[in-house]
Amino acid sequence: MQCMICQSGMQYFFSKTFTQFDLDQVDYWKCSACGFAASKTHLDMSDERWARLNNDFHSQTHYTEDNPYNRNQRYFNQALMLSLMRKQDLIPAGDWLDWGCGVGAVARLLRDYFDLRLDTYDKYFTPEVNAVTASALKPCGHQLVLNTAVFEHVRDRATLNEIESYVKPDSGCLAVHTLVPENVPANPDWMYLLPVHCAFHTNRSMQLLMDQWGYRCSVYNEHAKLWVMFREAPAAIEPKVAALNKAMGWQYLHFKPGFMDYWK
């Protein structure tokens, strides 16, 4: 199997046995070059089985009040982070898009509490606010493309490239929420191995994606658990980050040229 990030070969890593959602043994493979790991079992599924797995999992976990995967505090912190970055002129005004938005929780918070519009698109859910159809998406047309809890569900490079393709090529920003460790652990009990998670990035694989897509620096906030990547030069972004951090009175945004590898 070939790595979707760097095209190097991947080798068998470890297996985990599930007892729900029509899953049994799941085999995870790892790229020796960039550390990216993926479930070969999930990547080999038919589109129909993959859609059924996602529907079954999210129908059981997404809407219940005691849902352990429902991150309402994170959604609010993401909306807050984006609004503060807009105020600091780190993210330009214009069309904003949440690709793979679920029901549109971040967009609703931005609308209700920060007077900002975030358009929403999802292949599997019906967003509650600002929904746009696939035909209305604007290639190279958005100043911000956000995706939260999406990268770990992506089974092919074409989908990653599609998400990024909606960012304006000069001044647009890409915001990504996923878990990015230094190394993916060879541990079947690792908490991120959910039945619908099939792709696991590392600091190295994310740096390669930034290089391939032309992003030059990034910031991270640990409460929002969100990265925002910029095509502008680090020298143009860093003073604005410093100004926001000074106003907040603490290191609200962590900045770095290249990928902000916060989780070592």
PLM region descriptions:
Residues 1-144, 148, 157-161, 240-264:
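Conserved N-terminal segment of class I S-adenosyl-L-methionine
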Residues 110-111, 167, 210:
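A generic structural signal for well-ordered alpha-helical segments
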Residues 149, 178, 221:
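Active-site proximal loops enriched in glycine and acidic residues that flank catalytic Cys/His/Asp
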Residues 153-166, 178:
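A short, conserved alpha-helix within the catalytic core of class I
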Residues 167-174:
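Short glycine-dipeptide loop
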